Amino acid sequence: TIIIFCGGILVGSLLENAQLKDAKQITLNEKVNLQSLQLQQSYMESGLADCKTLNKILETNIDELTKKMGIVIDYEKQSFFNEDEFNLQLRDYFLTEIQFLLTSQEIDKTCAKDSIKVIYFYDESAADTQGQILDYLKKVFGSEVLVFSFNSGFNQEPMINVLLTSYKIEKFPAVVVDDQVFQGHTSVEVLMKTICNEINGIKGEMPKKCQTLFKNYK
């Protein structure tokens, strides 16, 4: 029994080390992607790069970062050891996401605005369905909407609290659509209307998908 128990600990430890290595590789990849994007932004400011291409790269990198973070979170849930290291991975992820957010805002200053930036602050409430609503809206609007999600209860990273303070967030879940702040659960209808109006402001016309969606939710 002791041998089996020790063997189980060894296997678990080896598995966790492998998972941690994977997590480190994930964050390294995204850091490299971010550095590449920032260099392309600087290149673009010299007038030699294409805004459309840059925005496409930004969207792809954010989507990949979100997918890969799901893997890191799964690893954390399965882990019994090295909690501090996993928390460092989470910090690294959130900092990288914040850098992507700031980079996207800088790109908007140089290029014609290409997408609506949505910031989602969530807590650990099992009853929170705001994330599902945002997933749905992301599927509907595609590249026209970029979503940045932050765990409001992750106190290990001070920058999250800086964002919460800057947007004066006091109730969760909270959603920021460009500069409009919604605190507490916000319905799909309200967010959809807000996003559609923002897109209308960018393109000068209401997208057909918005007209169809408005009819469905009347």
Which residues does each predicted region cover?
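Short active-site neighborhood of thiol/selenol oxidoreductases, capturing the structured segment around
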Residues: 94-125
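Non-catalytic, surface beta->alpha helical segment in thiol-disulfide oxidoreductase systems
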Residues: 1-4, 13-33, 171, 176-218
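Typically the conserved alpha-helix immediately C-terminal to a functionally engaged Cys/Sec
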Residues: 125-141
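Second-shell loop/turn segments in exported
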Residues: 75-86, 120-125, 150, 179-182
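Structured segments of extracytoplasmic/periplasmic soluble domains
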Residues: 136-144, 194-201
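Thiol-based oxidoreductase modules, predominantly thioredoxin-like and allied folds used
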Residues: 119-123, 142-158
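Extreme N-terminal leader/targeting regions
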Residues: 1-85
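Short, intrinsically disordered low-complexity segments
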Residues: 156-172
